[in-house]
A protein has these predicted regions:
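Extended charged low-complexity segments that act as oligomerization/scaffolding linkers
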Residues: 73-76, 124-125
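Short coil/loop residues immediately preceding or within conserved phosphate-binding loops
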Residues: 21-24, 80, 204, 267
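Surface-exposed beta-strand-to-loop junctions
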Residues: 75-79, 187-190
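Flexible, glycine/threonine-enriched loop-and-boundary segments that flank and lead into catalytic domains
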Residues: 13-24, 76, 136-170
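Signature of N6-adenine DNA methyltransferases within the class I
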Residues: 38, 45, 93, 97, ...
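Class I S-adenosyl-L-methionine
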Residues: 1-72, 92, 136, 140, ...
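Conserved SAM-binding motif I beta-strand of class I
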Residues: 85-86
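Conserved SAM/SAH-binding beta-strand->alpha-helix loop
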Residues: 89
Length: 364
């Protein structure tokens, strides 16, 4: 989380003054308990603190010898101006607000809060409950019950941040495959999800969150998500790849390294903007500890035009919907290219209707 926040906010904060920082708008549209929002808030507080140390030390409060901190009124301004979140779970929303308020008063003392009343700001306008993927317009004209409407929780984006777009959307969106979407949601809700341009074949719900995030960031904005790396090559992600191909900025690929306990997920950190970039900054991460300690290899800049794709996709590149073979290993890429002429796709031999199905836990 720290790594994602730093990588996303650092270029946006560079060269700004604390008053200019207050114009930044950062959101997590599936915020859960608010972990990403807490970290984003702390990054901005630390940035402003360091700025004042260099430019106006008298603005800071001296806690003890050698320790200075930002006044509570400044921290409140950062929280209420810059940090926004949405989640469909009302309990998660309340936890997120509570966590942010605890973070706000961290290391505060009775004297330090006396000049800032009320001590705790109201975050009702910052952290909202609703379905980030469904708007009121989406459900208009649909024949759905009031119970279904309550469960769907359509969200009006005019109700947050004044309806304006965000500078950064960051987070860890839910991963839900199509068959589970159909089990967990009503037909009406599934129908709405299928209107998304990235909903193709056996799509995953995180595709939709990527698409929605790109719609919600401003012209210079960035989206940074941790998502499974299968979107690089699965057929269901064809439309998503087409959607992000020109605007993908960075990709940290963890390969087989596992980030989540008790779950086998092949993860990546995906950063996408709104403007076209010619080269993809790519690197593999083979040790999570190195990432936290900033000891990972530098990014390889891979030209998007002619970016290596799956070798059995004849004459393919990043400008079509073919699977992407992204690697910074030149030896591996060379081997794959040499094998291209000899590889026969299984799809050229048989008709494939579904992949191998894992055994349901109910039968184990």
């Amino acid at each position: 989380v720290k790594y994602m926040v730093k990588n996303t906010l650092e270029p946006l904060c560079k060269g700004k003054t604390p008053p200019e920082i207050l114009s930044l708008r950062i959101a997590d549209i599936a915020c859960g308990s608010g972990i990403f929002l807490e970290e984003a808030y702390q990054y901005l507080v630390d940035f402003c603190t360091e700025w004042y140390k260099l430019n106006d030390k008298a603005h800071l409060l001296v806690v003890e010898e050698g320790v200075e901190k930002l006044p509570l009124v400044d921290k409140k301004a950062i929280l209420t101006n810059c940090i926004y979140g949405v989640d469909i779970d009302i309990h998660a929303v309340e936890v997120s607000k509570f966590s942010l308020l605890l973070k706000l008063i961290e290391n505060e003392t009775e004297p330090s809060v006396m000049s800032s009343k009320p001590i705790l700001p109201d975050l009702e306008e910052n952290i909202k409950c609703g379905n980030s993927l469904v708007t009121d317009e989406d459900v208009e004209g649909l024949n759905i019950t009031m119970e279904d409407l309550i469960n769907i929780r359509p969200f009006d984006w005019q109700e947050i941040n004044g309806g304006d777009k965000f500078d950064v959307i960051i987070g860890n969106p839910p991963y839900v495959k199509t068959e589970d979407i159909k089990k967990l949601h009503t037909n009406a809700e599934v129908k709405i999800y299928k209107k998304y341009g990235s909903s193709h074949k056996q799509f995953d719900k995180y595709y939709l969150f990527i698409e929605k995030a790109l719609d919600l960031i401003n012209e210079n904005g960035l989206m940074c998500y941790i998502v499974p790396n299968k979107f690089l090559h699965t057929e269901s992600a064809e439309k998503l790849r087409l959607m992000i191909k020109d605007k993908i900025v960075k990709l940290d690929d963890f390969g087989a390294v596992q980030l989540f306990k008790d779950k086998t997920i092949y993860s990546s950190i995906l950063t996408v903007g709104t403007t076209n970039v010619e080269k993809l900054a790519y690197r593999t991460v083979d040790n999570v500890a190195h990432l936290w300690n900033d000891e990972v290899e530098q990014y390889s800049l891979i030209p998007k035009q002619g970016l290596n794709c799956m070798p059995w996709a004849e004459n393919s590149n990043i400008n079509d919907d073919s699977p992407w073979l992204v690697s910074d290993d030149d030896v591996y890429l060379s081997m794959m290219k040499k094998a291209r002429a000899k590889i026969v796709s299984l799809a050229d031999i048989v008709d494939i209707y579904n992949g191998i199905q894992t055994l349901s836990l109910i039968h184990i």
